[in-house]
Amino acid sequence: MNILNEILENKKREISTMNHFALDNKKYPKYDLLKALSTKNLSFIAEIKLKSPSEGDIFPGADIIQIAKDYQNAGASAISVLTDKKFFGGSLEFLSKVKTNISIPVIQKDFIID
């Protein structure tokens, strides 16, 4: 089985057992992604990814809040947070923590299947 098929099968199992209201109901500040990326200055989206299928662990035990703050302080226009647990070491909890601790747009990055 190739890695994409493995990811697909894992995501199907994950979805079948997940609570469809998994995200908390907190009200987070909203930041305009289009506006953040439309400045005359350099715009970029930084990514928080703790591991990958090809490289394994990239940043084991990393402090994701500090990483997000460092990205924001370095001038990132937005931050992408991988939320796939098995293959990328992410979680919805990471997404929530990042959104709570920075003041730029945050993007959830995960696999979408249909």
Residue ranges and their predicted role:
Residues S103-D114:
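Conserved anion-binding
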Residues M1-S103:
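Conserved N-terminal beta1-alpha1 strand-loop-helix module at the mouth
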